[in-house]
């Protein structure tokens, strides 16, 4: 069993009780053939990163309703999420996971399975119970794979994201709260965070208790962080 570490978010990030700066780079496991994972992760580490981030595309892992694949036995091993995270840990990297249901990521349908469209006028990314029923079915399978990978259980996963850039899409906070609760009920006990564009109306659309806010931007960092500071309750500023 791996040594147990602790990770906390207070006025800054703390790893094993010591201040810790997350330097993260994104590398999505399903976009790189598994035989190249180690090489690419080592290159990420050589850049100075101590953490790798990846989204989890729902449509990759449940291409048909009720048919799940996390084994890596299909698609040339690209579905082996657990193997990827464990490899990152072996190479000395921490991990941040963004486990759907919507990922954006310039990925087909934002990661949603196409079969969702067969369910009439169901409203995606809302608290529509028809939609949430499908998310719940997916999470009941997904979360048991993710829970053992958390830092609290000897794994490398520091944090997990809820939804993605939701404040630019809607303001259904009940939806975000339900996703948060589903993850907690699925055994996720690491900090949960949100990632949104740095604007007041966007943060106000999506702010939910117990979710750490981060900003998503590519330039004008000071302006972005000044806005984020209004909503992160004195916590660390993070571009995620």
Predicted feature residues:
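N-terminal carbohydrate-binding accessory modules
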Residues: 1-53, 86
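Substrate-binding/catalytic cleft of secreted carbohydrate-active enzymes
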Residues: 2-3, 97, 101-134, 142-240
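Residues that line or immediately flank small-molecule/substrate-binding pockets and catalytic motifs
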Residues: 27, 56-59, 164, 217
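Short, flexible loop segments at the rims of nucleotide/cofactor-binding pockets, characterized by
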Residues: 29-31, 73, 214-218
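Short active-site-proximal "capping" loops at secondary-structure junctions
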Residues: 30, 57-61, 199
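Non-membrane alpha-helical structural segments and their capping/turn regions in soluble enzymes
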Residues: 34, 38, 75-82, 129-136, ...
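Aromatic-lined substrate-binding rim segments of carbohydrate-active enzymes
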Residues: 37-108, 179-185, 189-190, 207-209
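Short amphipathic alpha-helical/adjacent loop interface patches that line ligand
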Residues: 139
């Amino acid at each position: 069993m791996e040594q147990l570490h602790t990770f906390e978010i207070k006025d800054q990030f703390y790893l094993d009780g010591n201040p810790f700066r997350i330097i993260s780079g994104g590398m999505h496991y399903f976009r790189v053939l598994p035989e190249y994972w180690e090489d690419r992760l080592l290159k990420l580490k050589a850049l100075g990163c101590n953490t790798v981030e990846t989204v989890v595309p729902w449509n990759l892992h449940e291409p048909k309703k009720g048919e799940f694949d996390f084994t890596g036995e299909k698609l040339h091993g690209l579905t082996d999420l657990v193997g990827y995270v464990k490899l990152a840990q072996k190479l000395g990297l921490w991990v941040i996971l963004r486990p759907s249901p919507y990922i954006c990521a310039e990925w087909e349908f934002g990661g949603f399975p196409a079969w969702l469209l067969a369910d009439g006028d169901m409203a995606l990314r809302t608290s529509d119970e028809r939609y949430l029923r499908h998310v719940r079915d997916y999470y009941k399978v997904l979360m048991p794979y993710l829970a053992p990978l958390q830092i609290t259980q000897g794994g490398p996963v520091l944090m997990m994201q809820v939804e993605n850039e939701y404040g630019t899409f809607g303001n259904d906070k009940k939806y975000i709260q339900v996703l948060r609760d589903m993850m907690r009920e699925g055994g996720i006990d690491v900090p949960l965070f949100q990632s949104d564009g740095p604007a007041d109306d966007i943060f106000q659309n999506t702010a939910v208790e117990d979710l750490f806010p981060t900003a998503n931007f590519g330039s004008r960092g000071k302006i972005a962080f000044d806005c984020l500071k209004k909503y992160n309750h004195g916590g660390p500023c993070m571009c995620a």
